[in-house]
């Protein structure tokens, strides 16, 4: 069951990743080439000791903020895709995502928007995505970068802790299972 959960998650993440890449290649983002070149120059300058690490961080933060602000529409679309796929699809299909269907498992429990949202705070970083979009409008530059880095670190920590819980607990429950009251079960085979 552990391997099936991991496999289903990987299938789902790959599918969502492909959709996000397609969107990012279809929707134009302003100044991307210029900002990427600027980031490369900054990296070279810090590696050659031409600027201090503090100046590098400050300039990096400005570039990151501008890039994310210019791509907020794409970030919003990506967040919407995650919400639809990991919240709406399991409600409509009574517990399935494509990955879960392929490997023969599904969600069981009270499948509603709130419970699936709670579950996806841990597994997909949905809250981190939403908060990052909000931060674009309420902060800027170094504050924006610092807060999004902290959110990202917390998200990675949640995923790692939850993965170890699923690996080593006898009931296979991770943080997401406990806070959402939704469990992952094997589909009974019809004979």
Question: Which residues does each PLM region occupy?
Answer:
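Short, small/hydrophobic-residue-rich motifs at membrane-helix boundaries and re-entrant hairpins
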Residues: 1-143, 147-165, 172-191
């Amino acid at each position: 069951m552990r391997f099936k959960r991991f496999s289903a998650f990987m299938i789902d993440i790959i599918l969502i990743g492909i959709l996000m890449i397609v969107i990012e290649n279809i929707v134009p983002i302003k100044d991307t080439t210029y900002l990427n070149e600027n980031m490369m120059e900054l990296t070279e300058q810090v590696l050659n000791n031409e600027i201090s690490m503090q100046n590098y961080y400050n300039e990096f933060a400005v570039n990151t903020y501008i890039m994310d602000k210019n791509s907020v529409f794409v970030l919003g679309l990506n967040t919407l895709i995650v919400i639809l796929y990991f919240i709406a699809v399991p409600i409509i299909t009574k517990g399935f995502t494509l990955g879960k269907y392929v490997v023969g498992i599904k969600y069981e429990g009270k499948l509603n928007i709130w419970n699936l949202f709670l579950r996806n705070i841990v597994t997909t970083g949905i809250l981190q995505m939403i908060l990052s979009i909000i931060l674009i409008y309420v902060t800027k530059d170094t504050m924006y970068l610092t807060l999004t880095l902290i959110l990202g670190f917390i998200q990675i920590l949640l995923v790692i802790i939850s993965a170890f819980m699923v690996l080593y607990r006898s009931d296979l429950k991770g943080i997401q299972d406990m806070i959402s009251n939704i469990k992952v079960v094997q589909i009974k085979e019809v004979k």
